[in-house]
């Protein structure tokens, strides 16, 4: 340690050895052993553990695990930074050392002790410090970084290199509405092969706007329709895809979290989705969620178009065929888009009979009309996320297959969930407490809805509590899932919020900005955790 301190006190090291390094072309000649070499060797012999190296003007500072430092001046020993590039191959050609393609005038002599040898080639990589000595020794310092740590770091870097979507429209045309497709080409690159073995896919397509209120926000959501079906990022082949902007969600994760909950609950279909970075006509647009568009197909809403029905509950009622049930639930036909008069009459009567059964003296009469398990799963996710749209008002999707009951088939649209809504009724508030789906009707005022009327049935409550308890262990893993997903977005989110200021807001719609991505993610985790444990008690007290 005395020699180490003596070395640190040295103001300048005068002896020079020119070493071939990463990209260096100098010839190395054997001269007087450089000062500082023995101090570095003593640190190695003492078992000091390498932590990091930092190049500064004319020197390199080596830090060990005990935070002691050793300064190596470049005029003494050249220590090369190979953290971002491979080190040179070091071999012996005859009796002479060879670094890369250059043979050095340093003899390889194994009879010489380490103390009397010369450093031939020194470098540090992402793990530790290496020293090749003229006596054929390769000294590798112990490191605070294990192979497992390095593998995890490499995997994280790979995961953070999220796919890139480049959209080129014909003639650079803009995308101005939700009706007319603009022709162009889409290219999806996945250099890290995160989701498939295909690094790049390029295809002709049309693109238009999508969404309801989200279309009016600065960061635009889009729908893409390929000319031919194609697998994208490991998702089943199809023509139709959605690019969700998540402008209102400053974590960029709430839809991803909701689909994880959908997987846990086992809905008949969970839309697959991946975070991507998007460029439109070479202009960066930010982080989007590329996902399967909701539609009837064998890999999505897998029903028979000839005999079955696919419905959407949506207060905007922007499809061709719409109506309201006797309880005022705003319904739309998604498939068929234009039903026959007989089909329309059948469906309206079906929902009227269902709602009449909800008020029946027979509290279990509703079971003749609905797949109870799917409604329980729907309720659990909507209540857990405290979804302002989830009270049979918006973005709710049901199917009626021939010979089967009404089923809550899949989930959709969760950007204003988990504490991110700025317009909850004052009686429920935006905090993690209080029921919302259970107590509020589709017009967002306290009143009857399909779920709370089912809760009149003791058997329904028993099933609900049992299902909740079964799902709870998986629900408790979600905070770690959020942390993982946020870590994967760590680099991309910075670029997103350079493009879209994180402090921007959509008036009263969104929860106010917290000022940083880290705070937004922490808030999401805290809200979810508090909501989970509040509901755990509240549901079991029903």
Residue ranges and their predicted role:
Residues 213, 217, 335, 341-392, ...:
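Middle-to-C-terminal accessory/interaction subdomains
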Residues 70-75, 133-150:
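Edge beta-strand at a domain terminus
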Residues 182-245:
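Conserved oxyanion/phosphate-binding beta-strand-loop segments in alpha/beta enzyme cores
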Residues 18-21:
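C-terminal motif of bacterial Sec signal peptides marking the signal peptidase cleavage site
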Residues 24-42, 146-202, 479-542:
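Regulatory N- and C-terminal appendages and interdomain linkers associated
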Residues 225, 230-231, 245-246, 266-271, ...:
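Internal "kinase-insert"/substrate-recognition segments embedded within catalytic cores
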Residues 1-12:
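Bacterial N-terminal signal peptides that target proteins for export
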Residues 23-61, 66-94, 102-114, 120-124:
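Collagen/collagen-like triple-helix sequence repeat recognition
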